[in-house]
Amino acid sequence: AGHYETQIGDFLALLKKEPDFRRLVIFGAPGSGKTTLMRYLSLMYANQTPHELHPKAPQFIPVLLYLREEYPKILKNPVLLEDFLPQWVAELQKSKPLKTPPGWFAQQLREQRCLILLDGLDEVADERDRQRLRDWVDEQMYEYPETPFILTSRPAGYTEKAELKQDAVVLEVEPLDSEQIREFIRNWYLALETKKQGGQTDLGVQDDAAQQAQRLIAEIEQNPDLSEMASNPLLLTMIA
């Protein structure tokens, strides 16, 4: 398979018109930003702004399931998504449960209106449970062929009894490059200083943040071990 760099928006633009791209699996090391990416996609679609990722990205209703939290319920009663999601929605806000009209999710799923985001396909410790969860995901993809699915997994966890039987396009989250590391650090310190100053972003705050950022950037660029760690977003926040 060839290796080339692209943006997630390029794939979102193809979700409706290209059946081959309706099944995406996103690989990434722990802390590489897989869950953050899924949350970001969910937010962009919930705000009806996917065009910011790509001008041709179609609108969907996002459904983000954290499999590490949901898999016990799924395996206890492995029903179709159209039966699982109404109960899931009702439990999102227990103080004031949300109710969807009967058959609403079934209609949305069959009319290609939902984007199913499944985070952490590999995050089930028991091997048999992981296989059963994989089978359930496969069943949903088979049952709703028009509905796009995006899954995340660690590479090792995906091949160890979690690989899908359905054909999927596999993408990989790339490590941060040096310019992305610098931008991340600058934004990180600006956010910290702004919060520290009660939301103010005057020149003094910006200057303090810039000085702290520059010190860390210099330290990382002079230390190969730190530089390697900094390419992982989670480890970079720990260094900062």
Give the role of each language-model region.
Residues 1-240:
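P-loop NTPase signaling cores
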